[in-house]
Amino acid sequence: MSIKPEEISSLIKQQIESFQSDVQVQDVGTVIRVGDGIALAHGLENVMAGELLEFSNGVMGMAQNLEENNIGIIILGPYTDIREGDEVKRTGRIMEVPVGEELLGRVVNPLGQPIDGLGPIATTKSRPIESPAPGVMDRKSVHEPLQTGIKSIDTMIPIGRGQRELIIGDRQTGKTAIAIDTILNQKDEDMICIYVAIGQKDSTVAGVVETLRQRGALDYTIVVSASASDPAPMLFLAPYAGVSMGEEFMYNGKHVLVIYDDLSKQASAYRELSLLLRRPPGREAFPGDVFYLHSRLLERAAKLSDAKGGGSITALPFIETQAGDVSAYIPTNVISITDGQIFLQSDLFYSGIRPAVNAGLSVSRVGGSAQIKAMKKVSGTLRLDLAAYRELEAFAQFGSDLDKATQAKLNRGQRTVEVLKQDLHNPLPVEKQVAIIYALTKGFMDDIPVEDVQRFESEFFTFLDHNKKDLLDHIRTTGNLPEDADFKAAIEEFKKGFSASK
């Protein structure tokens, strides 16, 4: 079979026309220095701030410093295998984390990778970890309560959905316990909880996860953990990863609670990164933008307007103080960003008053408008009474002959302190809180010996559950107090059957 010359030429033409050359242009750079979670690379002229970069061994990095001749990269993973002279290439993607309901019940690292040994997570969506906070017109004022189940907080320092309430105190004063109790109390509240552990011991995080699992709270909780053994970039990114996961739910009209435990360690990690990147240090060696580090995170907590779906993110950031010094740099920064603070005092904690809330220094700037009417009515004077008692208590140590009014205030104060004590992991529904505070503020407990107050409380709750369930149901469903006569009659009836220990 002979092939004609014109056939050969047409075949060659066809081949040339159908030939496709896949030329990939990649922007690459060279590592010139590496160490302590930081790499310095030459090249990569067109890189974006915050862009993900890939090293030759597959480890990812994030562009942080953009300079004239080189870029500073924070390494998101083990950096021991990255060498001077290695290639680093652009991905064209901004740092993102996986989001969605598939994450509920799981423990992940700040990159959204599972670390609980329960296999991969099949998410379908992701969100950038840095995103703009909702604007003024997209927000609505805080008006729905977030019940923590902790008497001293729900009565005196109430928190609303969409609020940012700082929890501040020395180490070992019960900050994490407040977080866990608040998560446990959201069981039937249709609230998604995100617990971000920053720089905690792995054993501590495991304990928190186990507590949540045993009490059925892990089903509506995501745990994001950057432990103390992780490199500084992971600790720096963890809070942003947590709030991005929360935003996915918020923009779909759901309510989210995000707990950052704690932001002092994030600030320390950011200081470490900044100093390694040769950024100029400021007060306490923190970089100049450490305020912006926290403000851009906490401004993403909001109560959205109805037009945007009415979802919310409530933020509970933690700050650890040194010897109760709330006037240090990071504490004052975060106090000025948030809508109030709950101050936990170590001497109250050690004297057996737990939760160790200092009512005088704690404040909630917007939570009052979110309280239910019944709670507002019964707890109105509670904070002032407690603050007055603290003053009188110090004063009364010097003199024994006190007038009747002062003695009555001291007696009421002692009973108030006892009522506000609460056991660990024992959150209380709001209707029971209203009932016991009503009994306290209306003077029904003034004749109960101080040592019997807690027994009075538990027996009173049992009595209400069995005999006066309608009163509790009324508070829960309507948010209002029952008729005064009915409530008083119920308390009087219970007191007849209550026997004091002395």
Swiss-Prot record:
Residues 119-139 are annotated as: Disordered. It is an enzyme of class 7 (translocase). Its EC number is 7.1.2.2. Its main location: membrane. It is a peripheral membrane protein. It is found in: Cell membrane. It comes from the Bacteria. GO terms for molecular function: ADP binding; ATP binding; proton-transporting ATP synthase activity, rotational mechanism. CDD domains: ATP-synt_F1_alpha_C, ATP-synt_F1_alpha_N, F1-ATPase_alpha_CD. F-type ATPases have 2 components, CF(1) - the catalytic core - and CF(0) - the membrane proton channel. CF(1) has five subunits: alpha(3), beta(3), gamma(1), delta(1), epsilon(1). CF(0) has three main subunits: a(1), b(2) and c(9-12). The alpha and beta chains form an alternating ring which encloses part of the gamma chain. CF(1) is attached to CF(0) by a central stalk formed by the gamma and epsilon chains, while a peripheral stalk is formed by the delta and b chains. Belongs to the ATPase alpha/beta chains family. HAMAP family: ATP_synth_alpha_bact (MF_01346). This is ATP synthase subunit alpha. It comes from Alkalihalophilus pseudofirmus (strain ATCC BAA-2126 / JCM 17055 / OF4) (Bacillus pseudofirmus).
